[in-house]
Amino acid sequence: MSVSHNCGWSIWTLAVSFILWVLSQSGVATAASATAEVPVSIAPTEHVILFVLEGFGQNSLKGGTMPTLSRLVKEGAVTWSATAVKPALRLPTMASLITGMPVEKHGITWNTFEFSRGYPRAPSVFDYLDLSGGRDSAIFLMDESLYQLARPEPYTDYQMCGPLKPECSTDRIVSYIRQYFNKATSGHGYGHAILSLPHFLVVHLPEAGRVGASRGWTSKEYRDALRRVDKAIHSVMDIYQEQGLTKRTTQFVTSLSPEGSDANQEPADAAVPMVPWIASGVGIKPGYAIHQPVSILDTGATVMRTLGLQTHTEWDSRAVEEIFQAAFAAAPQGSSLQ
């Protein structure tokens, strides 16, 4: 009896031990499965920079002329054939970029500032950012024609430094941005509309296009201008790094005109220009070639998508969804990101 009892006890002990082992392994497998199914946590984007160039294309990067932009391309998503608009001029193209509308809808076909025409009636991405999430925008422009788009609102700040002022240069516009950020972080605002760091910064950098049109697209002067534009992009990104914002910032780069095309004169051919469109930074797939058709009109909706915002307004801008690492996650309601 004693032997039988001990054998029974041993068998029962082994059975219990086996069940516990199975349960523990099941828990490990479940935990591993759960870990595999949960995507890598990606910090939300709180700031977006949009660099708007002129006279820029894929060939502009050859010879190491633009190392900062080359790095953004390598670390981000790109298409070199985003469609622009007709007429292929600075003001109509910029109007389409910020309204997310084709020229036939926003109606701006001219290329100089005409006070009598007033501001465009169409809402802009700046309006949608405010309405959808209370996000502010700061816009730095380098051509007086773009005054046409500078409709004053409590959630936008515009600064202009165009060719009519001889002292204006790419370096000068960067210094304005640095001053703006210094005032924003001083605790005193800047005497303008926004009293905090802007959530959306637009930087217009047309120097390369102007130099290419006047001195030749194969000239040394054009390559030097590309280098200055690249240096400006690097300097603006340095400002964000100094403010500790790099890990919360996404950058976009596009151009109002391709290399070889003057944004002041419409080309003789009827083709719609193709321009670069680049996204890089927080939440963007690295080293990714965009497959879907992209239009510069899509920039506004993609910026909003990046910030976790949506608009149900009918406009022609569509988010370029394939560039993102994770599915859309709405920004917290009522958040005040700085």
Can you annotate each of these PLM segments?
Residues 13-25:
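Bacterial N-terminal signal peptides
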Residues 49-50, 68, 229-267, 303:
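Metal-dependent active-site segment of extracytoplasmic phospho-/sulfohydrolases and closely related
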Residues 49-52, 79-81, 96-98, 136-141, ...:
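Structural recognition of the beta-strand scaffold that forms the well-ordered cores
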Residues 59-94, 101:
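Short, structured active-site-proximal loop/turn typified by the sulfatase FGly-forming signature C/S-X-P-X-R
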Residues 94-98, 267-310:
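Substrate-binding rim/cap in mid-to-C-terminal beta-strand-loop elements of soluble/periplasmic
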Residues 101-216:
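His/Asp/Glu-rich, glycine-adjacent segments
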Residues 294, 309-338:
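Polar, surface-exposed loop/tail segments
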